[in-house]
A protein has these predicted regions:
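Hydrophobic alpha-helical scaffolding
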Residues: 49-53, 66, 70, 95, ...
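Secretory-pathway-linked proteins and extracytosolic
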Residues: 1-93, 97-98
Length: 216
């Protein structure tokens, strides 16, 4: 085994300015590449980490609540999204394995809070229980200056959402945004590449950049 030591002297303190891009775009930094061959290899690891018990003891009650007032399957998807947004508080506690492995859906419901991985897994579980094609999705926000294809490491992916395909169209659901409705995409992931679960692997999708009126 080899040990590499990097020593830097006389570095100036980065200046943070309002409206400036994230530090990764402007500040020199070391990037540990890791051992993944490509984004498929990295997603396989992520999917394995997300392979937890998805049993929800009171699932029938939750689904009955979600179905109330829904007149179409699309409204059921919207209600499911809204249920997770309103019942689960976004709180990222990332220490040890929890930085990469989501809590079980049952535990997330019990605690009433979860990080992006836990919330997206709960959303995926509830949608799949209703027969929808919901999939795990790993993505890097606009804070990251490189894509998972360019740099297949966990440094290029810092967020998790759920993608549901309905009538041939992908809907990107980020439940960490408490009030965003179905069909809208948070600004920080618009135009970003996402690794969307497909069979045993993943497919790379580029999220759309919405017009200004759809972001207000």
């Amino acid at each position: 085994d080899s040990v590499f030591t990097y020593v830097m002297h006389g570095l100036s303190v980065p200046v943070s300015e309002e409206g400036a891009p994230a530090w990764g775009y402007t500040v020199p930094h070391l990037l540990v590449i890791g051992s993944f061959k490509d984004e498929q290899d990295m997603f396989a690891w992520s999917k394995k980490m997300a392979d937890v018990d998805c049993t929800i003891p009171n699932q029938a009650e939750i689904l009955a609540e979600i179905a109330q007032g829904a007149k179409s399957d699309k409204e059921k998807i919207a209600n499911t999204f809204a249920w997770v947004q309103s019942h689960i508080r976004y709180l990222a506690y990332e220490a040890g394995v929890s930085a990469h492995q989501p809590a079980t859906p049952a535990e997330t419901i019990r605690k009433r809070y979860g990080d992006c991985k836990a919330m997206s897994l709960l959303l995926k579980t509830l949608l799949k229980a209703q027969g929808f094609d919901a999939r795990q999705t790993d993505i890097g926000t606009d804070d990251i200056p490189y894509t998972s294809h360019e740099v297949p490491t966990i440094s290029s992916v810092n967020h998790a959402i759920c993608t549901v395909f309905y009538q041939g169209k992908p809907y990107y659901l980020d439940a960490t945004n408490s009030y965003i409705p179905l069909g809208y995409i948070p600004t920080n992931i618009q135009g970003r590449q996402a690794l969307v679960e497909e069979g045993e692997g993943c497919r790379v999708y580029t999220l759309p950049t919405l017009p200004l009126e759809a972001c207000s």
